[in-house]
């Protein structure tokens, strides 16, 4: 039984789903724009339904404080867990993530997330979902030892690839286009019968860029930290510059310390 398919269990309503529904009702009654992401949005685009232990809500960074205040005023517990990307709302053992960027600081929630949002029914309500392009963009960088979202990216490409706004997706990745290309290569390997889901012109353009790349011997920067907060710490200790810091990234030294100290803890 999945949360998406059933709101009720034997003997009454599932308390966790009731928490999600109450939280969504509260937000929907406010004037704060928000999007539903995570398992709910993933299921809408891929038809892959799986159990979830939390609810992911996406808001603009400028709306995070207002969002938490809505729940504070209604008796929920709130916290700004990681100031560069994540807050949480709790009631009892249940919680909701309030997301305004990605853990590496790259996928910041901006107006485009809302402009291109799709509508769907979530727990009986018509709500807006994170666009598939933004889901691919943010998930493509999640490559930890304990969590790799590559399969999610490939499933999104398989089911939504022909309808994606590819120019917009390429713009989202920007200078990080090799990350997108790596997933497109894997997609062709995993689904040889669905290669037409990815425009040939996109693959052709990216592979030409790859062929034109030259070694940058003087550029001692490690972009691996955009993919994993833990697996490239050795490289930083060896003198590489962390790509999450300006001018390449948007995190501060304090953000990095807090995010690194949380390694091994449940986010």
Predicted features and spans:
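Helical scaffold of the NTase/Pol beta-like nucleotidyltransferase catalytic core
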Residues: 1-36
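Catalytic cores of NTP-dependent nucleotidyl/adenyl transfer enzymes across multiple folds
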Residues: 3, 108-267
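N-terminal functional module detector in eukaryotic proteins
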Residues: 12-16, 26-27, 59-62, 67-77
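Short aromatic/hydrophobic-glycine micro-motifs
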Residues: 32, 76-77, 162, 215
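Catalytic metal-binding acidic patch
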Residues: 38-71, 131, 153
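Short, hinge-like loop/turn segments at secondary-structure boundaries
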Residues: 52-54, 76, 97-98, 115, ...
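Conserved catalytic core of two-metal-ion nucleotidyltransferases
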Residues: 72-112
């Amino acid at each position: 039984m999945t949360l998406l398919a059933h709101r009720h269990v034997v003997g009454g309503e599932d308390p966790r789903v009731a928490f999600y529904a109450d939280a969504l009702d509260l937000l929907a009654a406010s004037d704060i724009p928000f999007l539903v992401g995570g398992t709910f949005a993933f299921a809408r685009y891929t038809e892959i339904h799986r159990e979830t232990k939390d609810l992911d809500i996406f808001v603009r960074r400028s709306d995070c404080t207002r969002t938490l205040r809505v729940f504070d005023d209604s008796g929920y517990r709130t916290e700004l867990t990681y100031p560069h990307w994540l807050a949480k709302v709790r009631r009892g053992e249940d919680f909701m993530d309030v997301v305004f960027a990605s853990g590496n600081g790259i996928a910041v929630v901006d107006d485009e997330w809302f402009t291109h949002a799709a509508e769907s029914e979530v727990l009986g309500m018509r709500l807006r979902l994170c666009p598939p392009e933004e889901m691919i963009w943010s998930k493509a960088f999640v490559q930890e030892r304990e969590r790799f979202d590559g399969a999610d990216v490939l499933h999104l490409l398989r089911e939504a690839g022909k309808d994606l706004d590819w120019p917009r997706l390429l713009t989202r990745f920007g200078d990080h286009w090799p990350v997108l290309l790596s997933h497109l290569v894997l997609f062709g390997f995993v689904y040889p019968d669905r290669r037409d889901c990815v425009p040939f012109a996109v693959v052709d353009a990216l592979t030409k860029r790859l062929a034109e790349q030259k070694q940058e011997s003087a550029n001692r920067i490690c972009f691996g930290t955009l993919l994993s907060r833990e697996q490239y710490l050795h490289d930083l200790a060896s003198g590489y510059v962390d790509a999450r810091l300006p001018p390449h990234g948007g995190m501060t030294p304090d953000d990095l310390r807090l995010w690194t100290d949380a390694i091994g803890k449940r986010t």
